[in-house]
Amino acid sequence: GFGCPFNQGACHRHCRSIRRRGGYCAGLFKQTCTCYR
């Protein structure tokens, strides 16, 4: 979701928009957008 697995930048922007420091694509096939604080 949120751009993953192909557009990690979209995931990162989504995470920034919910006041996280950023995000990356995680999981077996990089299909999950994971935010970090």
Curated annotation (Swiss-Prot):
User: Is Cytoplasm among the key words of this record?
Assistant: no
- What's the domain of life for this entry? Eukaryota
Q: By its UniProt entry, which Pfam families does this protein fall under?
A: Defensin_2
Where does this polypeptide localize?
Secreted
Task: Please name the InterPro entries in this protein's record.
Answer: Defensin_invertebrate/fungal, Scorpion_toxin-like_sf
Keywords noted in UniProt: Antibiotic, Antimicrobial, Defensin, Disulfide bond, Secreted
One term under GO cellular component: extracellular region
Keyword Translocase part of the UniProt annotation: no
Disulfide-bonded cysteines: 4-25, 11-33, 15-35
The primary site where this protein sits is: secreted
Query: Biological process (GO) annotations?
Result: defense response to bacterium
What's the entry's take on its domains?
Answer: Has the structural arrangement of an alpha-helix connected to a beta-sheet by disulfide bonds (CSalpha/beta).
Protein role:
Dual-function peptide with antimicrobial and potassium channel-blocking activities. Shows inhibitory activity against Gram-positive bacteria. Does not act on bacteria by disrupting membranes. Also moderately inhibits Kv1.1/KCNA1, Kv1.2/KCNA2, and Kv1.3/KCNA3 potassium channels. Inhibits potassium channels by interacting with the pore region. Does not show hemolytic activity.
The record's similarity note reads: Belongs to the invertebrate defensin family. Type 2 subfamily.
Q: What is this protein called?
A: 4 kDa defensin
- Organism of this sequence: Androctonus australis (Sahara scorpion)
